[in-house]
């Protein structure tokens, strides 16, 4: 399975300890860009772009890494996010996944037709230490999401996830290369 990348917006603000060495800030600095400026990208509509023959430019069934140069839940994207959700819903043949540190905002910005979650959207929450795991994971588990991922990256300290692991977690990954999966 191929993984396509879709960055509907770019830029972020350092949010917690895990952001100290953010790759987006490092990469943007090489090109003298300000990574703290959040802006809508020219590729915003990539999932629904069509070729001359009318077919979608992005072919399914691809996984689509979404918003890896920003945070999908960043405040500045509130005006654009409803259209991003609409495109995800339209492209049920693609599987979108995004990772966020701002999980506290998720319930407030879900689309009205979200229900138990779109079947083609996976959401991951980043927990870089025990404090962030204990703060973010209960919020994450309280919101309806069909496929949940816990990402311990960058893993700044040891993290005990046992209190948060349940049938609702599809996968856990850590930046040391270890991965746990709930099943197929």
Please identify what each model-predicted range represents.
Residues 1-16, 20-121, 130, 159-170, ...:
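Conserved Radical SAM active-site core
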Residues 125-129, 133, 138-178, 182-184:
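Histidine/lysine/aspartate-rich catalytic loop segments that bind and position anionic ligands
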């Amino acid at each position: 399975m191929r993984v396509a990348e879709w960055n509907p917006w770019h830029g972020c603000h350092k949010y917690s300890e895990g952001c100290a060495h953010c790759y987006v800030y490092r990469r943007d600095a090489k090109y003298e860009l300000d990574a703290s400026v959040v802006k809508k990208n020219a590729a915003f509509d990539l999932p629904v772009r069509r070729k001359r023959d009318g077919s979608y430019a992005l072919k399914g069934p691809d996984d689509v890494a979404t918003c890896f140069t920003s945070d999908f839940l960043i405040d500045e994207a509130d005006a654009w996010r409803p259209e991003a959700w609409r495109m995800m819903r339209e492209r049920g043949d693609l599987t979108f996944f995004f990772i966020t540190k701002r999980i506290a905002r998720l319930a407030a910005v879900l689309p009205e037709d979200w229900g138990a979650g779109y079947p083609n959207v996976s959401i991951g929450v980043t927990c870089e230490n025990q404090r962030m795991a204990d703060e973010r994971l209960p919020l994450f588990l309280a919101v309806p999401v069909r496929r949940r991922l816990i990402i311990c990256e960058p893993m700044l300290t040891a993290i005990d996830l046992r209190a948060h692991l349940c049938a609702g977690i599809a996968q856990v990954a850590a930046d040391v290369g270890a991965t746990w999966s709930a099943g197929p």
